[in-house]
Amino acid sequence: MDFPQQLEACVKQANQALSRFIAPLPFQNTPVVETMQYGALLGGKRLRPFLVYATGHMFGVSTNTLDAPAAAVECIHAYSLIHDDLPAMDDDDLRRGLPTCHVKFGEANAILAGDALQTLAFSILSDADMPEVSDRDRISMISELASASGIAGMCGGQALDLDAEGKHVPLDALERIHRHKTGALIRAAVRLGALSAGDKGRRALPVLDKYAESIGLAFQVQDDILDVVGDTATLGKRQGADQQLGKSTYPALLGLEQARKKARDLIDDARQSLKQLAEQSLDTSALEALADYIIQRNK
């Protein structure tokens, strides 16, 4: 199976898992649950669930067990996008080629849906059937996702990003923003897959962290590049939005060609990290393919 087929299979699997966890919720057919479904299920590359599945499968964990952490990390990602798009944040009206949640359902429902998706993520990790995961590892997974999505991770990065609007931000400060805002949840996805495998996954965490940190930063560099060279129809969101908000970006600081080189160098670093796992007879091909895709994608 080539990478596009793997990614397509992941999208299908992750969406089935998300639907299964959303379906039993109360208040079905109300605007807030419809907003949750719209924000979580319509479109998206599902890269974070892919990282959960790919890492877990590398250690022999079943898809059935990995559905829960894959759905949980995507719930956090979906909530973050819903809230990022709000007028008080990035004020975007287009996401994945469709009206953003607050445009379609109103700000109140968008806020509540984001809140509900965030808490659903932790309900999934605490309650879902994960037969191969010990209680110790389940608690570690909950703690990992909480840290990555809170003030020590994604929320802290978003706060730094908002504070930096309209200001000149040096490269080290820009990397600090994105290691938190984007990179923390990507690292969490990899770690959740590893923690699903117990001790053998835990032993690989230092290597996997290096891989995840490299692809997380590369993902943001490529996003910044696409904000310059992409188009709204392909991106599914407003092209040039970062420039309009006065945000510092890698192309603005480094120039377009040097930004591209930085992204390539980061992916080379990620691939180098995986060699240590390949030497242990682990199949890293899916993680390698995902790393390459990050800088080859056009949206």
Swiss-Prot record:
Keyword terms: Cytoplasm, Isoprene biosynthesis, Magnesium, Metal-binding, Transferase
EC number of the protein: 2.5.1.10
Compartment annotation: Cytoplasm
Residue sites binding isopentenyl diphosphate per the record: K45, R48, H77, R96
CC terms in the record's Gene Ontology section: cytosol
InterPro entries listed in its UniProt record: Isoprenoid_synthase_dom_sf (IPR008949), Polyprenyl_synt (IPR000092), Polyprenyl_synt_CS (IPR033749), Prenyl_diphosphate_synthase (IPR053378)
PROSITE patterns in alphabetical order: POLYPRENYL_SYNTHASE_1, POLYPRENYL_SYNTHASE_2
Required co-factors: Mg(2+)
GO MF annotation list: (2E,6E)-farnesyl diphosphate synthase activity; dimethylallyltranstransferase activity; metal ion binding; prenyltransferase activity
A GO biological-process term: farnesyl diphosphate biosynthetic process
Binding sites annotated in the UniProt record for Mg(2+) 1: D84, D90
UniProt protein name: Farnesyl diphosphate synthase
Species this protein is from: Escherichia coli (strain K12)
Gene expressing this chain: ispA
